[in-house]
């Protein structure tokens, strides 16, 4: 098992996206929103170990360095690994269209 630990940085855009997802849910179910917030942060923190375990965002075109981490139930953290740092760029709801990320 790879013992290397990576530094995980969350972009302002990803933070805004996460806040929007949690805030939207909080309007109807504050407890579920808090669970979502915790789940998102746990998933993102897990990238400190073996971030390469996750698939590429676009498996057909690996020229793009972006990878995706599925965070139950419906979210994806989109990130790139550069040296010993993981840069989380986006947090998207996988039920919605996110093909614009592939362009």
Predicted regions and their residues:
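Hydrophobic pocket/interface hotspot
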Residues: 14, 40, 47, 88
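Basic/aromatic recognition patch in beta-strand/loop cores that engages polyanionic ligands
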Residues: 52-84
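Enriched for short, Lys/Arg-rich terminal
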Residues: 1, 71, 75-103
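Generic structural signal for secondary-structure transition and capping sites
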Residues: 30, 45, 49-53, 74, ...
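Short, charged, surface-exposed hinge/linker loops at domain edges
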Residues: 39, 46, 62-65
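Short, hydrophobic secondary-structure boundary micro-motifs
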Residues: 34-35, 55-58, 100
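Residue-level recognition of specific faces of alpha-helices
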Residues: 17, 21-24, 43-46, 68, ...
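Arg/Lys-rich, positively charged N-terminal/basic patches that mediate binding to nucleic acids
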Residues: 1-39
């Amino acid at each position: 098992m790879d013992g290397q630990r990576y530094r995980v940085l969350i972009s302002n855009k990803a933070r805004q996206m996460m806040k929007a997802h949690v805030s939207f849910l909080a309007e109807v179910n504050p407890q579920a929103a808090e669970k979502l917030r915790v789940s998102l942060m746990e998933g993102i923190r897990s990238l400190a170990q073996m971030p390469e375990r996750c698939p590429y965002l676009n498996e057909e075109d690996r020229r793009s360095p972006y990878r995706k981490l599925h965070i139950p139930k419906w979210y994806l953290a989109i990130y790139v690994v550069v040296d010993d740092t993981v840069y989380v760029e986006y947090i998207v709801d996988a039920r919605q269209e996110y093909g614009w990320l592939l362009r």
